[in-house]
Curated annotation (Swiss-Prot):
Belongs to the lactate permease family. The gene is lctP. This is L-lactate permease. It is a multi-pass membrane protein. Its main location: membrane. The chain crosses the membrane at residues 12-34, 38-60, 67-89, 127-149, 156-178, 193-215, 224-246, 250-267, 297-319, 339-361, 374-396, 411-433, 505-522. It is found in: Cell membrane. GO terms for cellular component: plasma membrane. It comes from Halalkalibacterium halodurans (strain ATCC BAA-125 / DSM 18197 / FERM 7344 / JCM 9153 / C-125) (Bacillus halodurans).
Length: 524
């Protein structure tokens, strides 16, 4: 890590304040000045460039190299994964598979508390893992409204449910991005993934209970307690095992599929004595044959299979130095700098999703390759601005890391000493509330967390996991999430009402994560 100086003023408090200007500016642009995300990110990138060069004395060539590295990593693998994941989802919708898939879930039980577990929790988590970026909140909220839920109630429930899966959205990008940051102590995404098995399970286990309590109070919990226990236990345990032994990429997809499957089997033998129907009305789903249901789920079976193959050590060995596929990696040093930029064409998770998408199209009669290419073009256009924003934010993070700004901030927050682990999730909460993204939050704050961890002697991976967990709790109230949810259920203009509904649960979960992180810091 190239750092000329992290204390140019020979006064840590002043140096840290100047180092914090890029983060403060980005947050002010997004909240006070109401600038578009891309405009705020580009302005902040420009200001960071001047601060890193003029104040922290990062050489011009290294500054340019930092930005180039950030932009390339924002495009590949991050942007690549986003585009491929959303494209696969669009293919499933256009081919009619998604409608059958949706019906297969609704048809499991007429009890709408059970439907909330299946759609609001399990399917929400599945879509978060497969697509992310607001897709699960929008789709699941609309589905619940179609079943008779009140619009704002449906939006609130989906936002809260997303707290169990937001850490691993879009094939695990929020944690996977750790590998692109070059963190203090060589912290990797796998290190953080394993640590989330300690920070997240209690939240994951609690959320299904909270959802049913919000819908039907303690009476609802008592009446469908067996179903809640199946949902909470299977999802929590399976996600913990996957984050420990496989990694972040499938940490939403496999647990949600497994939970839906086992809950469906359980409900064949058990149903609540009293069928709970909102307003006394249920929503009947169209019957589909088992063959059609299996076909409908096929894009996501393929996705799971290919991503799992890509995560195997044997496959990664093919891409390592001396491996048969080593040629597929491309790297270069940015001219005028010492900073290396690399692109892994085959090993990127996006390539696994690409294969799932192409296989789906070639084996489905309802959609042709030409139509799927048109969908891909539209996805690229629709997500070009968000991806550009991610590129700019990674560029900011790289400048701050190479320029010493991150080290200055880390040294400053480390002055809180052993109390810092309690504050760690709060940093993450602030990051997601302001940027609307766990990806951007980890990009900005993970370097600060690891630097502080190294200074105070706390496991840096624990602090990054806490940063992630705290950030996920902010998704319940971040303006971006609220806007998506209200728009999806036709309640645009009622953002304040929805925020008021979710705010206390966001704060409550954040306090729990902070206390739990502090306890864990005493043990690890």
């Amino acid at each position: 890590m190239l750092v000329e100086t992290y204390d140019p003023f020979q006064h840590l408090a002043v140096s840290a304040f100047v180092a914090a200007i890029p983060i403060l500016l980005l947050l002010l642009c997004l909240t006070v000045f109401k600038m578009q995300g891309i405009q705020a990110a580009l302005l902040t990138l420009l200001v960071t460039f001047f601060i890193a060069g003029l104040v922290f004395h990062l050489p011009f060539g290294e500054s340019i190299g930092s930005i180039v590295q950030g932009v390339v990593q924002g495009l590949w693998p991050i942007g690549y994964i986003i585009v491929m994941a959303v494209w696969l989802y669009k293919i499933a919708v256009a081919s009619g598979k998604f409608a059958v898939l949706r019906g297969s879930i609704i048809g499991i039980s007429r009890d709408q508390r059970i439907q909330l577990l299946l759609i609001g929790f399990c399917f929400n988590a599945f879509l978060e893992g497969a697509a992310g970026f607001g897709v699960p909140i929008a789709i699941c909220a609309v589905l619940l409204v179609s079943l008779g839920f009140k619009p704002l109630q449906a939006a609130m429930l989906c936002l809260i449910a997303n707290g169990a899966s937001g850490a691993f959205g879009a094939i695990g990008i929020p944690v996977g991005i750790i590998d692109t940051l070059g963190l203090e102590g060589q912290v990797t995404s796998m290190d953080v993934s394993m640590m989330t098995a300690l920070t997240l399970p209690m939240i994951n286990f609690t959320i299904p209970f909270l959802l049913i309590w919000l819908m039907d109070s303690w009476k609802g919990i008592k009446e469908i307690l067996p179903a809640i226990l199946v949902t909470s236990s299977v999802y929590t345990v399976s996600q913990a095992l996957i984050t420990i032994f496989i990694g972040p990429e499938l940490a939403d997809i496999i647990p949600s599929l497994l939970t839906m499957g086992l809950l469906a089997l359980f409900l064949k033998r058990w149903q609540p004595r009293n069928t709970f129907l909102l307003n006394g009305n249920g929503c009947e789903s169209e019957h589909a044959s088992l063959k059609d249901v299996i076909k409908a789920w096929s894009p996501f079976y393929l996705l799971t299979m290919f991503v799992f193959l890509w995560s195997l050590p044997a496959f990664k060995g093919l891409l390592a130095e001396g491996g048969a596929l080593e040629f597929a990696k491309w790297a270069f040093v940015v001219p005028g700098s010492s900073i290396e930029v690399g692109v892994d064409f085959i090993g990127a998770t996006g390539t696994a999703i690409l294969l799932a998408a192409v296989t789906t199209v070639t084996t489905t009669k309802m959609i042709r390759m030409k139509e799927s290419i048109s969908l891909l073009k539209k996805v690229i256009v629709d997500f070009s601005i968000p991806i550009m924003m991610i590129c700019a934010i990674i560029g900011i993070a790289k400048l701050m890391t190479y320029g010493g700004l991150t080290m200055a901030l880390g040294e400053a927050v480390a002055t809180t000493g052993a109390f810092f682990p309690f504050l760690s999730p709060i940093l993450g909460w602030i990051g997601v509330f302001m940027t609307g993204s766990v990806v951007n939050n980890n990009t900005l704050f993970a370097p600060i967390q690891t630097t502080a961890g190294a200074i105070i002697g706390t496991n840096p991976s624990l602090l990054v996991a806490a940063n992630t967990a705290g950030g996920v709790m902010a998704k319940l109230v971040s303006p971006q999430s609220i806007a998506i949810a209200t728009a999806a259920v036709g309640e645009t203009g009622n953002e304040a009402a929805l925020t008021k509904m979710t705010l206390k649960y966001s704060f409550g979960l954040l306090v729990f994560v902070s206390v739990w992180t502090y306890i864990l810091s005493l043990l690890f």
